[in-house]
Amino acid sequence: MTRNYYIGLDVGTSVIKAAAFSEAGKLIKIVSEPAPKSKIVDRASQDMNEIWDITWNLLAQLVDKLDYGTPISIGVCGQGDGLWMLDQNGKPVTDAILWNDSFAQGSVDECGSTWAAR
């Protein structure tokens, strides 16, 4: 009897996780690693290349020595809003600016008060 499994991938703000689940929904294996921290003080950003590398390494760890069958699908979820800029070749332009970054808050406040004054 061939067994199949599903892969779940959660690329979160603080932790990246990969998990394998049976067709019945039972957790078979899970691996995780902390997401990289911002290298810029007072910013919420992440190196997209690091995110990519961690994600691929976790997927490799997940399937390594997983004698369970064949993966039949993969579900992916990630962080909410943010700015993840890529060039025309699909390569990162800069670090991802995360949903919880407040660098532009002063500009937003200024625009809001200017707009409200109209």
Sequence positions of predicted segments:
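N-terminal glycine/serine-rich phosphate-binding loop of ATP-dependent small-molecule kinases
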Residues: 1-95, 106, 110
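Glycine-rich phosphate-binding loop plus the immediately following alpha-helix
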Residues: 100-118
